[in-house]
Regions:
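Radical SAM enzyme core and accessory elements
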Residues: 1-54, 374, 395-447
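Radical SAM enzyme [4Fe-4S]-AdoMet core and its adjacent flexible, acidic
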Residues: 213, 217-232, 236-343, 353
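C-terminal accessory region of radical SAM enzymes
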Residues: 300-335, 361-410
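Short cysteine clusters
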Residues: 99, 103-106, 340, 354, ...
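Conserved alpha-helical substructure of the radical SAM core
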Residues: 73-193, 198-202
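Short, acidic, Ser/Thr-enriched surface-loop or helix-capping motifs
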Residues: 21, 350-351
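N-terminal [4Fe-4S]-dependent radical SAM core
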Residues: 3-28, 52-92, 136
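Short glycine-enriched, charge-decorated loop/helix-capping segments at active-site entrances
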Residues: 109-113, 217-225, 419
Length: 447
């Protein structure tokens, strides 16, 4: 037997926490047990006779494993199995790349007047048929409307697609969900009535750019110059209709103090309504320290301002939880078992013009296109798409082999590696940052 390479131990006030990032198991150790584990690290088999109960707990939790276990290969296989999950499909549709707001941080190129054509709508509906036909193990079908501002084309695109989606999936043993990422300004009662009639679990993501005038100045619109209060009211209206809402708050070092003030807007909601809020604070990428490559990380330091901003975000997360809200930081710590929805093999993003993409966090242009939607509803993917998804992370990100977070990080994002084309680390190669991530994982684990 041997100790797992993915064991992490750290002290706390009353003792030590032992956590394994592969099995996601944790143990509380007093000082005596922590010392015993350290002393017997290289001869762990001897511990079975000295302290059999402790040894059994270590084996049961995956802290001690058989000598022939290749843990790195096990993580690679776990990641591949997650991405190849045949029981779910994630289909994203961009009805338009036009938008009724002008946000300074937006990475997309607005295409004024763009709209999915009737023929592309028909091809998209045929794609839904194709997905249902070719995926006999399908148990969860997730449909997303993105953009641009998708509600600009509610009648022209969303209604016919969603109506067809509802009709084609009704009566099947499939969990169906719809999520609409919107700026929220165009929501009205007629739309909400339509979504309820579809009989499909529907959720919204609505974004704020600060509190009050900070939001209004950042989110420019001639039609909606005072959009902050409009969005607050629309979120509350959705909650009253028993619809879940992801309240995403984009913040910078200048307005991080707004986070809690925005949450306070929902204190007057009833407890059941607050339970339907998923709070997601996101630091705007132009404001954050985004260095992830080794070369870049060697040339930066995390300054005091960054630490203060992070602390304010963490404080707001705790406050949201105290109000009974759900909390979902934008970067899932465990992206192996819970990958980005666009990383799955069974995932596609259909642009208004029929171009097909994987990642929705990059511009929808020719350089990033991964395929084309054909008229019969099938997708003609680039030949190397699956080889890039399934490529072993340790083949090109060699630092992952020695990293305690590999079982939860999985070597990072395919798109990010494509952007940098060199070794990188989501935690900036910083061991303290990695340990903090472990502590967050432990906080999510029942001790």
């Amino acid at each position: 037997m041997k100790t797992s390479r993915y064991n992490v131990i750290y002290s706390q006030e009353s003792g030590y926490i032992l956590y394994n990032t592969y099995t996601c198991q944790s143990l509380y150790l007093n000082s005596e047990l922590a010392d015993i584990l350290s002393d017997y690290d290289t001869c762990i088999d001897d511990l079975s006779s000295l302290h059999p109960n402790f040894f059994k707990a270590l084996v049961d939790g995956g802290f001690v494993i058989h000598n022939n276990v290749d843990e790195i290969e096990a993580v690679e296989q776990l990641r591949i199995d997650s991405l190849a999950d045949p029981s779910q499909y994630h289909l994203t549709i961009n009805p338009t790349l036009d938008c009724n707001f002008h946000c300074w941080y937006c990475y997309e190129s607005k295409v004024k007047g763009s709209e999915m054509s009737p023929s592309t709508i028909e091809s998209t509906i045929s794609l839904i048929d194709d997905i249902l036909c070719k995926n006999p193990q399908l148990k969860r079908f997730h449909l997303y409307f993105f953009g641009g501002e998708p509600l600009l084309k509610f009648n022209e695109v969303i209604k016919p697609v969603l109506k067809a989606f509802s009709e084609k999936t009704t009566g099947r043993d499939i969990l169906r969900t719809v999520q609409i990422t919107t700026n929220g300004a165009l929501l009205n009662d007629a739309m909400l009535s339509f979504f309820k009639k579809c009989g499909i679990f529907t959720a919204f993501q609505i974004t704020f750019d600060g509190y009050g005038d900070n939001h209004n100045k950042s989110r420019f619109s001639k039609i909606h110059p005072k959009s902050y209060q409009l969005l607050i009211n629309n979120v509350k209206k959705l909650l009253e209709k028993e619809i879940f809402v992801t309240v995403r708050v984009n913040y910078t070092h200048k307005n991080a103090e707004d986070l809690i003030r925005i949450l306070d807007e929902f204190k007057d909601c009833c407890e059941e309504d607050r339970k339907r809020i998923i709070y997601t604070p996101v630091r705007i990428w132009q404001d954050a320290t985004n260095a992830v490559t080794k070369k870049a990380c060697d040339n930066i330091s995390i300054n005091e301002s960054d630490c203060i901003v992070t602390a304010k975000s963490n404080e707001s997360i705790k406050y949201a939880a105290s109000l009974g809200m759900n909390v979902m930081p934008i970067n899932s710590i465990d992206s192996v078992r819970n990958p980005c929805k666009h990383s799955y093999v069974n995932a596609a993003s259909i642009n208004y013009n029929g171009d097909v993409f994987k990642c929705c966090a990059r511009a929808f242009n020719d350089d990033n296109r991964e395929g084309i939607l054909k008229t019969d509803g099938t997708i003609e993917w680039k030949a190397d798409i699956n080889s890039r998804i399934f490529r072993k992370r340790t083949d090109f990100n060699h630092v992952c082999k020695e990293c305690i977070l590999f079982p939860v990080c999985g070597g990072g994002c395919v798109q990010t590696f494509k952007d940098f084309n060199e070794e990188y680390c989501l935690y900036r190669f910083d061991e303290k940052s990695k340990l903090e991530a472990v502590k967050r994982l432990v906080s999510l684990t029942k001790m």
